[in-house]
């Protein structure tokens, strides 16, 4: 245990918080190019074919990003915007693709939570 004098002289060492999305290097989003677009299965107890893309970011780092929403138009060489945010049942997927930005089209026929999926307001 440190003495009062040691605390005055050196202080306490603060614990550095580890980034949840290190590949973004402190940026809110990063642009990247799709290298592979495929599906994977989630871990137990869930069952589905989750759409994911391997994306090479502008800083040269390659990450696995989740494609949210129903249906997508992404393929190899598509330019996408990537944000942080993990997918709980897909190990190793710590990023998400932003729908409605760059080459990623918004989700069609989306009525609720539209801004999250880049969907325009439906006509009356």
From Swiss-Prot:
GO terms for biological process: translation. Coiled coil: none annotated. GO terms for molecular function: rRNA binding; structural constituent of ribosome; tRNA binding. With S4 and S5 plays an important role in translational accuracy. Interacts with and stabilizes bases of the 16S rRNA that are involved in tRNA selection in the A site and with the mRNA backbone. Located at the interface of the 30S and 50S subunits, it traverses the body of the 30S subunit contacting proteins on the other side and probably holding the rRNA structure together. The combined cluster of proteins S8, S12 and S17 appears to hold together the shoulder and platform of the 30S subunit. Part of the 30S ribosomal subunit. Contacts proteins S8 and S17. May interact with IF1 in the 30S initiation complex. It comes from Caldanaerobacter subterraneus subsp. tengcongensis (strain DSM 15242 / JCM 11007 / NBRC 100824 / MB4) (Thermoanaerobacter tengcongensis). It holds the Pfam family Ribosom_S12_S23. Keywords: Methylation, Ribonucleoprotein, Ribosomal protein, RNA-binding, rRNA-binding, tRNA-binding. This is Small ribosomal subunit protein uS12. PROSITE patterns: RIBOSOMAL_S12 (PS00055). Belongs to the universal ribosomal protein uS12 family. It comes from the Bacteria. NCBIfam families: rpsL_bact. The modification 3-methylthioaspartic acid is found at residue 89. CDD domains: Ribosomal_S12. One of its GO terms (cellular component) is small ribosomal subunit. The keyword Transmembrane helix does not apply. Transmembrane segments: none annotated.
């Amino acid at each position: 245990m440190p003495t009062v004098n040691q605390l005055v002289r050196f202080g306490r060492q603060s614990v550095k918080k580890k980034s949840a999305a290190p590949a973004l290097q402190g940026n809110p989003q990063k642009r990247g190019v799709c290298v592979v677009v495929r599906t994977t299965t989630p871990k137990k107890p869930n069952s589905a074919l989750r759409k994911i893309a391997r994306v090479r970011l502008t800083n040269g780092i390659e990450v696995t990003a989740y494609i949210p929403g129903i249906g997508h138009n992404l393929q190899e060489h598509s330019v996408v915007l990537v944000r942080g945010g993990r997918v709980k049942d897909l190990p190793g997927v710590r990023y998400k693709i932003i729908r409605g930005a760059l080459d990623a089209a918004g989700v069609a026929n989306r009525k609720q939570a539209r801004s999250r999926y880049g969907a325009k307001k439906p006509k009356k």
